[in-house]
Structures are given as C-alpha cells and as structure tokens.
Amino acid sequence: MKPLNIIFAGTPDFAARHLQALINSHHNVIAVYTQPDRPAGRGKKLTASPVKELAVSHNIPVYQPGSLRKEPAQQELAALNADIMVVVAYGLILPKVVLDTPRLGCINVHGSILPRWRGAAPIQRALWAGDKETGVTIMQMDVGLDTGDMLLKTYLPIEDDDTSATLYEKLALQGPDALLQALEGLANGTLTAEKQDEALANYAEKLSKEEARLDWSKSATQLWQEVRAFNPWPVSYFEHQGNTIKVWQTQVSTTSSNAAPGTIISASKKGIEVATGDGVLTLLSMQLPGKKPLSVADILNARGDWFTPNTRLNHEAQ
C-alpha cells in the first residue's frame, strides 16, 4: 500500500497515542494541527499540548490556528496537499471547506459505538448509563457533530470494575489499531461507509461538578455507575459535617433496607453501607478534604465518629 500524506489534528494525550501510531507506521505525517498553547499549572505558564510536544520531538511542522474559519488558515492547510486529515479530540470546529480539502476528506476517531454517544463525553456517559459495551468508531467527518458515515467499528466490553480512567486507557490502545486498519481500507478502496441511524442517536453531554453530587434518592445501581463514570473527574461527592467528601469506589450491596435515603446502615472495615432510593450502596474508597483517597477502613480509623450507623449523610450543600 502506498503511504498516505496525512495531516493530523488533535490535542490531548488520547490524541497523542494515535499520532504516535501514525508516526510508527509507513504513512507520512506531513503536518500537525493542535490547539494554541494554554496557561497551565500553578504558575499559569504557557504549555504545549501533548500532541504538539510529540510532533516537535519528531520534527513535524506544527500549526496552531485559533480557528479554521478564516480564509488564510484554510489556504495554509490546502497548500499542504494532504491525502487525508485524521482528527482525534482536536477541539476546533472544521468548516465544510476544510472537510473537503484533502483528497480522501477528514476522518475522526470517536470513543463510542456510534450513533450512540455522539459528543464530548462518550466514555463517561457509557458508564453513567450502565452500558455493557463501548468501542471505537472511525467515521468520515461531515459538518454535523459526530454524524458522519461510519467506516469501521471495534467493540470493547465494559467490566464491572471499569472507570472512565480504565476505559480511557483501553480505548487509547484500541483506537490506534482501528485507525491504521481504516486508513489501509481507505487507501485500497475496500471500506464501505455505513450511514448512522438517527433513531438510535443520543448525545454525551460534558460532565459538570454539580452533576457529581451524589443524590441518595437515586438507585444504588445508578449511583455505582455514576461513581465509576466520574472517576477520575469530577469525582462523585457528598456533603457531611460541613465537609465535601469525595467517593472513589463503591459497590451495590445485597443488604436490603427501608431506611431513608442517605442513612448509614452499617460501618465496618469492609465498607460503609448507605440506604438509597432503591437498594443499598457500599462505600469502599473515599477522600476527606485535603487528604488522599483512602480505604474505608483508614477513613473510619481517622473519622469513625462521622460515620456511625443511623447517621444520615447530608447530600444537600451546607
């Protein structure tokens, strides 16, 4: 297969994994587009994206326009004369003129099985909703939000102990292989594009800190899903004794209870059991203000007085 001349557009670490795979392949990455450097850290020093750092280390030209809507930026991209543009978590809207510029158009690596979970947070929403599987879709980009024709899909079962952090890692391994496979199919003309079924489409809204507050009136199963979805960000939490306590790990208990939602049923080294709107949730790992995440056994040693049975955890902001 003849090597393709590729423009790569991406910004975070997830994108950098895909760029690395392209660099390692026989294809030519002729240019990289990434978001402008942003202030980061305590000193608010201007920091390059992971994609830019990788590109610079391989002497690949880097472009960082604030927008691709203006003609000079579009002409600059067209002058690169690329066969295809690969887009992974870039963060800028690509207007139609840009989508139509490369010979084979623009393709995108998306972290869900489309048309389910279009949008910004597909990995987190799959966990939040209790989906049993997720995966990667390579699609031909159009002007809509993740609405383009699907070129290739790979599947990944979601395990009970998966969090957004672990799924991110698994998909960051699966995505590059799927991308290389799709590029081979496109170059050889062996891929058949499949239209998305609009009736099955839904949107993965961005997560918010407000949404991470545990509402004990929900079911234990839903809360267990949320804790996994919001790990590592924004991290589920509840308010108690005037403090915000983060919850990193839970499981659904087999204990039954008629207690009011938010009531502690039992507290032991094995976990703190809390009544919910439906079922009982066992808290296994938590984080007190200013401390590291700890097992419940360690939390009870430090603050056992906060978590005595029949105490009602206050999920309203103080």
From Swiss-Prot:
The keyword Transferase applies. The keyword Lipid biosynthesis does not apply. GO terms for cellular component: cytosol. Transmembrane segments: none annotated. GO terms for molecular function: methionyl-tRNA formyltransferase activity. (6S)-5,6,7,8-tetrahydrofolate binds at S112, I113, L114, P115. Belongs to the Fmt family. Attaches a formyl group to the free amino group of methionyl-tRNA(fMet). The formyl group appears to play a dual role in the initiator identity of N-formylmethionyl-tRNA by promoting its recognition by IF2 and preventing the misappropriation of this tRNA by the elongation apparatus. PANTHER family: METHIONYL-TRNA FORMYLTRANSFERASE, METHIONYL-TRNA FORMYLTRANSFERASE, MITOCHONDRIAL. NCBIfam families: fmt. This is Methionyl-tRNA formyltransferase.
